[in-house]
A protein has these predicted regions:
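N-terminal metal-binding scaffold of metallo-dependent hydrolase/deaminase domains
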Residues: 1-21, 299-304, 319-320
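Divalent metal-coordination and catalytic microenvironments
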Residues: 3, 8, 29, 37-40, ...
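His/Asp/Glu-enriched, well-ordered alpha-helical/loop segment
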Residues: 228-301
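Active-site core of metal-dependent hydrolases
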Residues: 138-231, 239, 244-251, 270-272
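Divalent-metal coordination cores built from histidine and acidic residues
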Residues: 48-140, 144-164, 207-217
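Glycine-rich beta-to-alpha transition loops that act as phosphate-gripper elements at the mouths
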Residues: 93, 117, 167-173, 298
Length: 324
């Protein structure tokens, strides 16, 4: 396969014999594919350069102080930026004293406390004006108070009016049901704190997608949280639900770049095929007009998923980051 890139975009994809002339050529002995996208990171707790070298060319940050993360997201658009493209939610909307305001990992401003439906809607308006790519809401009843049903409804409505998805951190009995009832778009983690009923998972499969984040509960070990999350995810998928790749990078011992442990958990404990995992992993199809964000594992990952940890090439916005 030959891919021709120009000014950060893919210009042409096809066989070598039909390719248009290019100013520079690079031959790579590997499997050429789109770069990976991690839909749940805290990039302020990670090294963006290492994330990119590991094959993740786009990330979505799901909770960080707005005065830090939005300028960083803007900077990631520049050709000189050493890291992945960053899209950001900004701070997580929460109740006064709610998660993550007391967490050690979260600097001041990571949680945005709201009081009442009007304040909740205004928070969404402000974040949208600053360039938020999504709105994250905290429904962690195990760590503290959560937004009221009225506040949650106002958040979802205000986000919908601005074309923004709402992703929910659901933790604690009944929080998944609350999120679904309010009309959120996504669960930022697969629920791990309780085994969800078949009826809840069937409703979820029709309404939300789930960001995987399995390795954050295990780091290579088998835990009760991992067993609950994978059981919920397998049944969610059996009901027709969509899973996308995400790691919660920055929290715990998650490696920068593509987390092969996460990928293997999706296959071994959830039952996803290699093709399904790659579809969940990549930022988008390899096609003309798309971003020139490419990686080349040493082997075909459809046959050996561990090849995603052995990269021969990383290209970000048409710029060669590394080539072996």
């Amino acid at each position: 396969m030959t891919v021709v890139c120009d000014e950060g975009r893919i210009e042409w994809v096809g066989s070598a014999g039909l390719a248009p002339r290019a100013d520079h050529e690079l031959e790579v002995d590997g499997f050429l594919m789109p770069g990976a996208a991690d839909r749940h990171v805290h990039i302020g707790l990670a090294d963006p350069g290492a994330v990119l070298l590991g094959g993740v060319t786009a990330v979505r940050d799901l909770a960080w102080p707005p005065d830090v993360i939005f300028p960083l997201a803007d900077a990631s658009e520049l050709p000189t930026f050493n890291g992945p493209l960053i899209r950001a939610a900004g701070p997580m909307i929460t109740a006064p004293g709610g998660y993550p305001t007391a967490e050690r990992w979260a600097p001041p401003g990571t949680g945005l406390e709201v009081r009442g439906a009007e304040e909740a809607a205004t928070a969404v308006e402000v974040l949208a004006g600053r360039g938020a790519a999504a709105i994250k809401v905290s429904l962690n009843a195990e760590a503290g108070p959560t937004p009221t049903d009225g506040e949650l409804a106002a958040i979802v409505q205000a986000a919908g009016e601005r074309g923004l998805p709402v992703t929910a951190h659901v933790q604690g009995v009944g929080q998944a049901e609350r999120a679904l009832g309010a009309g959120v778009s996504e669960f930022a983690h697969c629920p791990w704190s309780e085994r969800l009923s078949e009826s809840v998972l069937e409703a979820a499969a029709k309404a939300v997608r789930i960001v995987s984040t399995l390795d954050i509960w295990s780091f290579g070990n088998v835990t009760s949280e991992l067993r609950t999350a994978t059981d919920n995810m397998a049944r969610f998928r059996a009901a027709g639900g969509t899973v996308v790749y995400g790691t919660d990078l920055g929290n715990g011992a998650i490696p920068p770049g593509i987390d092969v442990r996460e990928v293997l958990l999706l296959r071994e404990t959830v039952g996803m095929t290699a093709d399904e995992i790659l579809e969940a992993l990549v930022a988008g199809p390899l096609e003309s007009g798309g971003p020139a964000d490419l990686i080349a594992p040493a082997r075909d990952p459809r046959e050996d998923l561990t090849a995603l940890g052995d990269l021969k090439l990383v290209i970000r916005a048409g710029r060669v980051v590394t080539a072996a």
